[in-house]
Amino acid sequence: AMLGGIRPGKVHASVREAVNGGAGDDGLLQRFGLAVWPDVEREFKLVDRWPDTPAKQAAWAVFERLNGLLPATDDDPQEWRFSPEAQAIFYEWLIPFETGIRGEELHPALVSHLAKWRKLIPALALIFALVDTPDTNGVIHEGELIRALAWAEYLRTHAERLYAAALIPETTGAHALLAKIKGGKLCDGDGVLWE
């Protein structure tokens, strides 16, 4: 798993290559299932405060507990499965999801991205179970799955936004030019400001 950030210009190039069959069309981009494309506020707001100490301590306790888990072996596998109720919810989500990604409406690059969610959704539910309900004898309940599905709903909007960077004609340059003209920062060939 990777966490981090990237500048929009860099990701635009990667997405264009992935969508247009260039060097970036190697499946790597589709593996960033937790990719988000947040809005940038135009007004800067300084936030300088002490971290929430109890929340920080609770998070570290989870990290320490997860770090103490014994890894599975061939002789002693650790199996987690959905409860019957969670399995029913998963199928209720999966069937229309699979139908949707097999349709004609979505770009193939976005379909490749979303197809990875067959694994991502159960993986998120497992993470939530390991964090919040680790003593359930390897059973992932509907609460953890519903949270994973809520994440999927949120992540889908960001995936669509990510791929739209290459699928919708680029207008960033036009917006920048218009801002300079409106701001009185653009001159003609004789040095006269445009209005």
Question: Which residues fall in each region the model found?
Answer:
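Phosphate-handling catalytic cores of nucleic-acid transaction enzymes
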Residues: 1-195
